[in-house]
């Protein structure tokens, strides 16, 4: 409603199936007309008695990212001012039986490498394909959820295949700048 993503999306004119044109300038998955009652009425997606529904999993959406990453020296030589600096990276795997829990060991690993604690992190963007991902992560880390996916995650705004990482980076960077935060964590 506030238009926080407006500066992060390049408007593109598209031709619709019926031949008309429209401007694609906002995330297509946002459902402002949803309610808790509508979500509670959705049928399970995978098993008749399952818990995963279209309401607690991300939809596949369109997206094509572009980010420019370079060394500080290169930016200086080109006359560009860096907006952020990557402090550390980490990769971790998890048992596929407990699907989508890899952000838990990855968080511990990257914070250890960066010499930071979770309390020092201002904002967190978790790439959650299902609502259970940040919930499991929070249970293990004890993180303050008021810092997590503060403008909505993939369940709320979409999961563009091949664009998720760049979308998370862009959202995190812009929100850190907007709020004056210093450290962000992206999974």
PLM regions with names:
Residues 11, 59, 67-69, 85, ...:
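Structured core elements
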Residues 5, 32-35, 57-61, 96, ...:
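Generic structural signal for well-ordered, non-membrane alpha-helical segments
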Residues 118, 139-140, 144-149, 154-187:
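Internal helix-turn-beta structural module
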Residues 1-77, 140-147:
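N-terminal extracellular/periplasmic Venus flytrap/periplasmic-binding protein-like
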Residues 14-17, 87-156:
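Active-site pocket-lining segment
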Residues 36-101, 105, 112-114, 170-171, ...:
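Condensing-enzyme catalytic core mediating Claisen C-C bond formation in acyl metabolism
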């Amino acid at each position: 409603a506030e238009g926080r993503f407006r500066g992060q999306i390049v408007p593109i004119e598209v031709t619709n199936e019926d031949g008309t044109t429209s401007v694609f300038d906002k995330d297509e998955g946002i459902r402002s007309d949803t309610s808790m009652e509508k979500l509670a009425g959705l049928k399970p997606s995978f098993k008749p008695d399952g818990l995963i529904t279209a309401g607690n999993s991300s939809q596949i959406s369109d997206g094509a990212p572009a980010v420019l990453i370079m060394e500080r020296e290169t930016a200086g030589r080109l006359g560009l001012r860096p907006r952020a600096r990557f402090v550390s990276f980490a990769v971790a795997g998890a048992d596929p039986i407990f699907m989508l829990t890899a952000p838990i060991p990855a968080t511990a690993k990257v914070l250890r490498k960066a010499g930071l604690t979770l309390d020092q992190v201002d904002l967190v963007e978790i790439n959650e394909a299902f609502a259970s991902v940040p919930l499991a992560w929070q249970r293990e880390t004890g993180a303050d959820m008021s810092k997590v996916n503060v403008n909505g995650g993939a369940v709320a705004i979409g999961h563009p295949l091949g664009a998720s990482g760049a979308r998370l980076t862009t959202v995190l960077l812009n929100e850190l700048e907007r709020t004056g935060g210093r450290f962000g964590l992206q999974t």
